[in-house]
Amino acid sequence: MKRSSSVSVEDEKSARRKLDVVPKLHFVGCSHLTDYHLMEKLGEGTFGEVYKSQRRKDGKVYALKRILMHTEKEGFPITAIREIKILKSIKHENIIPLSDMTVVRADKKHRRRGSIYMVTPYMDHDLSGLLENPSVKFTEPQIKCYMKQLFAGTKYLHDQLILHRDLKAANLLIDNHGILKIADFGLARVITEESYANKNPGLPPPNRREYTGCVVTRWYRSPELLLGERRYTTAIDMWSVGCIMAEMYKGRPILQGSSDLDQLDKIFRLCGSPTQATMPNWEKLPGCEGVRSFPSHPRTLETAFFTFGKEMTSLCGAILTLNPDERLSASMALEHEYFTTPPYPANPSELQSYSASHEYDKRRKREQRDANSHAFEQTANGKRQFRFMTRGPSDPWYGIRRPNYNSQPQYQRGSYNREGGNMDRSRNVNYQPKRQQNFKPLTSDLPQKNSEFSETNAMNQTSNHSHADGQRYYRPEQDRSQRLRNPSDYGRQGRQSSQSQQPAWNVSSRYQNNSKVQTTSRASENADTNKTQHNIKYIDSYVPEYSIARQSANQKTNEQHPSSTSLHQQSTSDLKSPSFHENSNVDDTPK
């Protein structure tokens, strides 16, 4: 008995030793954001922002997707919960995996909100960025390689009863090894009809449940979704795949609608108008009211894609059909003759490597290019100049009453008065329609090149050219860049910084505000000759053509009256002439 008891004690001790030898299990949780070094922004969307980052531990590059919480009161977004749950439940070589979760704890002391990041492997490109890269030209074996991987990933999702609901070129990631992966499962959803899928593998189950109708980017949205169908199947993903396939051949999206109705119109022009034969019960859908007035269109898809080959046209046409029940599934597409006829799909390892191309970078460059093209215009000699802004409904100044040219400055009492000034000098806003740049002085001895221009100025001469000092000055219709010269050309009075940016038509107000310069009244007969000559020289500095035309008139007058007194009287009358004479016979051609 004692022996047996001793044996049992020894066995118990040995068992305890074995338990101590067993290694402890390490349960790995979420990492912290400080474990990664954020490098640059790769993209952004409604549900998140993606950053390129490097893990400090081993130097590997990852993509961190920050989950946006627009309203924290509603809690964690349900779309993010679905995305995390789906990515943790699936595993395929053509689907982006979820490597880790990173959190940033909220800190009330420093008023810092908490953030959650999804960590996925970094991919060098997305399909949209490659298509917009002018140095990248896809070959047909390369397109077949990408399409075969896309069909394989889509087939795996549908076999797992998962709807992606946002397949597009920007959500297809490609690395420099030629591997394509489906990403962005923010709108993905699991289908509940498991029994039907088990009995009919490869076929879309007839969904009995209503889902959200506003899914999939518009350019890749199927016609049944656009018509308001909410009991859709996996066929909506196949329509998106067909649009992506055609986009890879075309180099751009094939259906770029600006609205839902415009998108339907473009679909019907390519795939034909819906009928009971091509799309049964389409008239019962809630969105058919706006489509009834559309004209009837025949199907032109086979003609539009004929140059890409018979096999490509056959496969793409079988996918882009109006009837979702007749639409080709992913498993059927993999067995299509498109992949078994030459040229055969390329091996991913044999594909060419490219520099990083992402849709977000291309979009930023495109927006910057559009902004620059809006601000500048191309001139006749090929140079770019600043575009003169005209007033229109899109201008925030549109509808404001036109101020007087001789009114007070905009800035009064320390505030800005947009109605009180001549123009907003910080913006190139013109209060009058842009006219021809013809330079004509207000004299009775010089002819007019454009009668219409002269009549317009004659009608507005009282309001536009009459000043408080009684003198009349010509206001050239020029661009602001031509009107504002070097302040040193204005003379001693024009060197002041506060006066250097004033337009030419404000000459009299400038002299009126300067106490050192006394203006001459129209009624005064004994005008100062030196002051008048200075005014003529001042206006000539703005309008060289005015000086040339005035000298031409003075030369002809000098031939008739060679005395200097007549010449001075003629130049003085140039400034005081009250109106235009359009039927003058004097030639104003520069000599």
Curated annotation (Swiss-Prot):
Alphabetized GO MF terms: ATP binding; cyclin-dependent protein serine/threonine kinase activity; protein serine kinase activity; protein serine/threonine kinase activity; RNA polymerase II CTD heptapeptide repeat S2 kinase activity
SUPFAM superfamilies the record matches: Protein kinase-like (PK-like)
Region (Disordered) location: 341-534, 549-591
Region (Binds to pct1): 442-523
Biased composition range(s): Basic and acidic residues: 358-372, 466-482
EC number: 2.7.11.22, 2.7.11.23
Composition skew (Polar residues), residue ranges: 404-415, 428-465, 503-534
Phosphothreonine, modified sites: T212, T565
Any Pfam family hit: Pkinase
Protein activity control: May be activated by autophosphorylation or phosphorylation by a separate activating kinase.
GO biological process terms held by the UniProt record: intracellular phosphate ion homeostasis; positive regulation of transcription elongation by RNA polymerase II
Annotated stretches, region: Interaction with pch1: 1-385
Composition skew (Low complexity), residue ranges: 491-502
Active site (UniProt): D166
Keywords: ATP-binding, Kinase, Nucleotide-binding, Nucleus, Phosphoprotein, Serine/threonine-protein kinase, Transcription, Transcription regulation, Transferase
Subcellular location(s) of the protein: Nucleus
Domain of life: Eukaryota
Chief place where the protein resides: nucleus
Described purpose of this protein according to its UniProt entry: Component of the positive transcription elongation factor b (P-TEFb) which consists of cdk9 and pch1, and which phosphorylates the C-terminal domain (CTD) of RNA polymerase II and spt5.
Quaternary state and interactors: Interacts with pch1 cyclin via its N-terminal domain. Via its C-terminal domain, interacts with RNA triphosphatase pct1 which is involved in mRNA capping. Also interacts with pcm1.
Name of the protein: Probable cyclin-dependent kinase 9
